[in-house]
Swiss-Prot record:
Taxonomic lineage from the root: Eukaryota, Metazoa, Chordata, Craniata, Vertebrata
Residues carrying Phosphoserine: 392, 412
Keywords: Acetylation, Chromosome, DNA damage, Nucleus, Phosphoprotein, Repeat, tRNA processing, WD repeat
WD repeat ranges, renumbered to this chain: 61-100, 102-141, 145-185, 188-228, 289-329
Signal sequence region: none
Gene assigned in the entry: Wdr4
Protein name: tRNA (guanine-N(7)-)-methyltransferase non-catalytic subunit WDR4
Cellular localization per UniProt: Nucleus; Chromosome
């Protein structure tokens, strides 16, 4: 899966990442001059046994691109994983790198526990490892494993359950204290599960998105599906039909009015829903359209929806609800210095310009067996006919004439 530019936010601290670098600053504008910058290419690299190829020589060490990042619940800690198979942990007040630790495989997602004592990382081989926050140099511990690639991991707000989403359409709910003990499976998706989110204000509910182009609501402890929203049915006339390209790269929740937004990588659209908790249903509200590709979105509780887009002049925009409709905030709502920092650091975002859909390779390959069978049958019949013609002489050929001569002479006698 390719790395793309992304956002992470906690309280008023916003992180913008791209390539191997990230910038961290305040969204208020009062601390715009206090910008923390980090480049993973400068981080310590340690060789592991998995880094050696079959011939014993060092294998590809990676590009240092950031694959995933997240804040802890309080915002006190920030963690990221990169393409060089490292987990890097930071303290945010003040910003300081606490540790650089190696992971076994390249990671696809990570999250902090609610107690902020551990970081859970999910990797491409289907395993989840936990790393201590309180012991920054401690090694990772294997917690659980799937038989296929993991695409997301989440923890319930009470730290009782670990939820994992994989390429084989499954969402597993495991007990955190004994991850081998499975509480339930949430089954129903027909393609890979790209993202999951436990609803913060309703911790018994789970949102999930998939390559099948649906957004689903679950009561995850029982594995019961409450609702399935087909995103293809929300497209405008003339847009490309079908579910491919509607796998969400981000599900975000805004606690103020229970808004849920869904960002899909292949369309410059953000779908807006509202959660009706009393009915346990999602209500579709609006489609936000953009003239540029949207890389990521994230909610700030006090202000609205931040949107990171492929536009050098306005890389970061803010959207707010006005009279029940989401609208782009005036230019003055986004600090000029904040946008200036991003324009000056545009080189770190350029690597995400024009990148392909990172989920494209995850779709199941489909085969039309009947068409293939009929085609092969036709080819076989044509070959048989060709061989038959080669064995049989054509009418009027010398061989045909010779065979006819004895009969003719007998009649003449």
């Amino acid at each position: 899966m390719a790395s793309s530019a992304g956002l992470a936010l906690c309280a008023q601290t916003l992180v913008v990442r791209g390539g191997s670098r990230f910038l961290a600053f305040s969204t208020t504008g009062s601390d715009d001059d206090c910008v923390f910058t980090y480049d993973c290419s400068t981080a310590e690299k340690k060789a592991t046994p998995e880094d050696k190829g079959e011939d014993g020589q060092p294998a590809d060490t990676g590009s240092d691109s950031i694959l995933a990042s997240t804040f802890s619940k309080s915002g006190r800690y920030f963690a990221l994983t990169d393409d060089s198979k490292r987990l890097i942990l930071f303290r945010t007040k003040p910003w300081q790198c606490l540790s650089v630790r190696m992971v076994v495989r390249r990671c696809t997602a990570l999250t902090f526990t609610a107690s902020e004592d551990r970081v859970l990382v999910a990797d491409k081989s289907g395993d989840v490892y936990s790393f201590s926050v309180l012991e920054p140099d401690g090694c990772g511990r294997l917690e659980l494993g799937h038989l296929s690639m993991l695409l997301d991991v989440a923890v319930s707000p009470d730290d009782q359950f670990v939820l994992t989403a994989d390429r084989d359409e499954k969402i597993r709910v495991s007990w955190a204290a004994a991850p081998h003990s499975i509480e339930s499976f949430c089954l129903g998706h027909t393609e890979f599960v790209s993202r999951i989110l436990v609803v913060p204000s309703h911790p018994e509910l789970l949102l999930s998105s998939s390559g099948d182009g649906t957004l689903r609501l679950w009561e995850y402890r029982s594995g019961r599906q409450l609702q399935c929203c087909d995103l293809a049915g929300l497209q405008e006339p003339g847009e490309q039909p079908g579910h491919k390209g509607l796998a969400a790269s981000r599900i975000a929740f805004w606690g103020q009015e229970s808004y849920v937004v869904l960002l899909c990588e292949c369309v410059p659209v953000v779908f807006v829903f509202q959660l009706d908790a009393s009915r346990q249903q999602l209500v579709f509200r609006q489609r936000l359209t953009f003239p540029h590709r949207v890389w990521d979105v994230v909610f700030e509780e006090a202000r609205g929806l931040w949107v990171l887009q492929d536009c050098r002049d306005a890389p970061l925009v803010l959207w707010r609800p006005v009279g029940g409709e989401w609208q782009a905030a005036p230019d003055g709502a986004v600090s000029p210095r904040l946008c200036s920092h991003l324009r000056e650091s545009w080189a770190m975002l350029e690597g995400s310009v024009g990148t392909d859909d990172s989920f494209r390779s995850l779709y199941k390959a489909t085969f039309d067996n009947m068409t293939s069978y009929l085609k092969k049958k036709e080819e076989r019949l044509q070959q048989q006919l060709k061989k038959k013609r080669q064995r049989s002489p054509f009418p009027g050929s010398p061989e045909q004439t010779k065979k006819a001569c004895p009969g003719q002479s007998a009649l003449s006698c």
